[in-house]
């Protein structure tokens, strides 16, 4: 018996016409298929690479390695305070431009110009080539022709996206569609206390996404990670969600989430009782400055709502929790059977040491839960 309302077709699968036959596994084990994905997906769609808070002032920058797209980009705030991105490649000999100790590692900082470590060519924050060593020794050199190659960049609700496809004219907001439109106005910008973790996973990137977008596994895999009353709830309704939405390549799952705080405090760990925090985040929801949630959150307006999980194709997931914190996941493929998994927790800045520790407890607990 269903615990939550289902569509008239009887199932969400039939409601969205997803098909009911077996699904091929070939796309997750085929090296040839992965090579097709690299060009058809990661070089042709909008990819989230960070947030505007990573660029607090003119000259702030960070790099992003896009192994699946065979490239690296540098994202910066230019001299006009605009967010821009360029291929992280010097136009002289094609060497990586921005890096510190190891060329393959991402880096960040603040600067007035970028200088290539090979021959010293320099570029300003607008990407223009401003200095060439021994320029007079070159023949008919026009520095204006050798600026950094720009990458199409746009921002949605503070999230920075890049698109490597010069032929794609689809605006970011149009690409993200109605699911993203339903979140406009949510105060992501208030959640500037950030904790990140990263793991190298020996699995196809889509397999991890599949695991994080279904709740079929929850009563089995996570039963012993939950307190008694939560575990019973998992067993009774854990296979169901409040609502699903599919919009083009994107999707959303609305879930009853966890109990914060649990009903039986005697069943939680002592540190959780002291800090008022645990697996599903701090128990005490901070003020985020809004009286009503945007229409895209808890679309069923169910009183048992706990979180909504949004997947924006191809590899960006946003989880928004009832207790006013946000978790994002990124899945960056490095081969047909490996990827980099990134988890980032966003909180309202803590006002006390206890609030800070509550957030950190939630982060380390969720890391164990997620990995």
Where do the model's predicted regions map?
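Short, compositionally biased low-complexity segments
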Residues: 1-18, 180-186
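Low-complexity, highly charged intrinsically disordered N-terminal segments
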Residues: 13-40
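Alpha-helical packing segments of well-folded alpha/beta enzyme cores
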Residues: 33, 45, 69-71, 204, ...
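A common structural microfeature
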Residues: 38, 43-48, 61, 70-72
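Generic structural signal for secondary-structure transition and capping sites
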Residues: 42-46, 95, 217
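Short Pro/Gly-enriched beta-strand edge/turn motifs at strand-loop
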Residues: 44-49, 56-57, 132-137, 310-315
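Rieske [2Fe-2S] iron-sulfur-binding domain
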Residues: 55-166, 170-181
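C-terminal catalytic domain of Rieske-type non-heme iron oxygenases
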Residues: 82, 154-155, 159-371
């Amino acid at each position: 018996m269903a615990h939550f309302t289902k569509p008239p077709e009887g199932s969400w699968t039939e409601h969205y016409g997803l098909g009911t036959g077996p699904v091929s596994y070939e796309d997750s084990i085929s090296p040839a298929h992965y090579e097709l994905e690299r060009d058809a997906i990661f070089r042709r769609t909008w990819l989230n690479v960070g947030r505007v808070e990573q660029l607090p002032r003119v000259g702030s920058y960070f790099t992003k390695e896009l192994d699946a797209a065979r490239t690296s980009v540098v994202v910066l705030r230019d001299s006009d305070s605009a967010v821009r991105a360029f291929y992280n490649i010097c136009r002289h000999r094609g060497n990586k431009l921005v890096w510190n100790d190891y060329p393959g590692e991402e880096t960040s900082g603040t600067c007035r110009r970028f200088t290539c470590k090979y021959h010293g060519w320099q570029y300003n924050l607008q990407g223009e080539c401003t200095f060439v060593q021994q320029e007079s020794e070159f023949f008919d050199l026009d520095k204006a022709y050798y600026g950094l190659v720009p990458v199409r960049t746009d921002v949605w609700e503070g999230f920075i996206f890049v698109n490597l496809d010069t032929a794609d004219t689809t605006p970011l907001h149009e690409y993200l569609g109605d699911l993203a439109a339903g979140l406009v106005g949510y105060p992501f910008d208030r959640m500037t206390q950030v904790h990140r973790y990263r793991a190298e996973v020996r699995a196809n990137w889509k397999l991890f996404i599949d695991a994080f977008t279904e709740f079929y596994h929850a009563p089995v895999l996570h039963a012993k990670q939950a307190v008694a009353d939560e575990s019973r709830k998992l067993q009774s309704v854990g296979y169901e969600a409040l609502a699903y939405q599919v919009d083009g390549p994107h999707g959303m799952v609305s879930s009853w989430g966890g109990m914060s705080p649990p009903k039986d405090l005697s069943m939680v760990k002592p540190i959780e009782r002291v800090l008022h925090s645990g697996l599903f985040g701090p128990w005490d929801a901070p003020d985020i400055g809004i009286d009503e949630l945007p229409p895209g959150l808890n679309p069923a307006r169910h009183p048992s709502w706990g979180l909504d999980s949004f997947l924006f194709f191809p590899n960006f997931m946003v989880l928004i929790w009832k207790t006013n914190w946000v978790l994002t996941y990124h899945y960056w493929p490095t081969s047909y059977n490996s990827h980099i998994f990134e988890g980032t927790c966003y909180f309202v800045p803590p006002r006390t040491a206890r609030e800070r520790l509550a957030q950190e407890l939630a982060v380390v607990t969720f890391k164990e839960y997620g990995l």
